[in-house]
Amino acid sequence: MDKFKEIRPIVLGIVKRDDKILVSKGYDKIKNETFYRSIGGGIEFLENSKEALKREFKEELNIDINVGDFLGISENIFTYNGRNAHELILFYNVEISDSNYKEKYHIIDDNCETDAMWINIDKFINKELKIYPE
């Protein structure tokens, strides 16, 4: 089945440092829109959400994390690059050690390249920058 025609379970980690959160930068070429999203990804069959989050951080940022408290779940129905998608998202607090701290991380995921960076949370609250899911 086409992955854009099913409900996809994903997990995202909320990483805070001072007044900033760690997010990856994305771009929707159909909407001509730059957006940001917390780090994470799909939960594989028979994989629990905490293990999926650890795996995603290792794959995307090459760092080990400590998964903290469960923050909640959200349903996200959206269009990305002209295709409909539907996600159920589990959110966790995440901690990274000082030895893994960088101002910017380069991500290569599914043959796409982007960066993850620390952005002041006020930029999202004040709607200066777009974060998904809202």
Predicted regions and their residues:
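Short secondary-structure boundary/capping segments
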Residues: K3-K5, G13, D28, G82, ...
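Short, flexible active-site-adjacent loop segments at beta-strand->alpha-helix junctions, enriched
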Residues: D19, Y27-D28, S74-N76, I96-D98
